[in-house]
């Protein structure tokens, strides 16, 4: 409500929440205890950035495209701010769980998994109600819109893969044509 009607949200703060979520997942990847990360698999900051930014951007884009067609009141910026602010539970719960993972025994690893699951459930609830308030939808219409957004995300990913493959084929064709012309000369 405050983000939409009282204009308390900003893009700068949204970018801060995104950076905080990326840093949290990076810390989780390198800071988990041995019980949860026995092979010392570390992830790069780049991988964590892609893992946060790409799904967020896909959701915001798909939601904005879909709600533009179905009388949504939110702009792209409003949807971005609402979804970015929804990332707040991630550092609040994942960082303490990661710290706790260094001291827990094997019987307590389920608690850490539960805390991580709780963070994502809280995130989902915030995204759901944030988009509902942003677009001024009823509960049922927002539920249908969220399902449509998820389908649109899959469709956008399919189009992106198709486009990337097509560009690769065109580059390969041009390379083959240039190679054949060089052989003929």
Segments predicted by a language model, with ranges:
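Context-gated lysine
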Residues: 4-7, 77, 141, 169, ...
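Selected alpha-helical membrane-embedding segments in polytopic membrane proteins
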Residues: 1-77
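Hydrophobic alpha-helical transmembrane segments and adjacent short intramembrane/lumenal linkers
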Residues: 63-158
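Generic secondary-structure transition motif, activating predominantly at the C-termini of alpha-helices
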Residues: 3-7, 84, 178, 182
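Membrane-helix interface segments in multi-pass membrane proteins
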Residues: 24-52, 96-120, 154-185
């Amino acid at each position: 409500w405050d983000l939409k009607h009282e204009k308390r949200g900003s893009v700068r703060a949204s970018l801060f929440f995104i950076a905080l979520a990326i840093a949290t997942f990076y810390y989780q990847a390198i800071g988990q205890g041995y019980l949860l990360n026995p092979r010392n698999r570390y992830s790069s900051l780049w991988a964590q950035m892609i893992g946060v930014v790409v799904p967020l951007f896909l959701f915001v884009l798909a939601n904005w495209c879909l709600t533009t067609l179905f009388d949504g009141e939110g702009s792209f910026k409003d949807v971005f701010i609402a979804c970015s602010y929804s990332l707040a539970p991630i550092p609040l719960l994942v960082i303490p769980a990661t710290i706790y993972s260094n001291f827990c025994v094997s019987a307590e690893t389920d608690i850490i998994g539960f805390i991580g699951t709780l963070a994502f459930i809280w995130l989902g609830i915030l995204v759901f109600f944030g988009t509902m308030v942003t677009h001024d939808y009823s509960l049922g219409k927002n539920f249908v819109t969220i399902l449509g957004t998820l389908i649109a995300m899959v469709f956008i990913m399919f189009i992106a893969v198709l486009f990337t493959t097509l560009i690769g084929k065109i580059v390969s064709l041009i390379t083959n044509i240039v190679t054949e012309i060089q052989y003929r000369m």
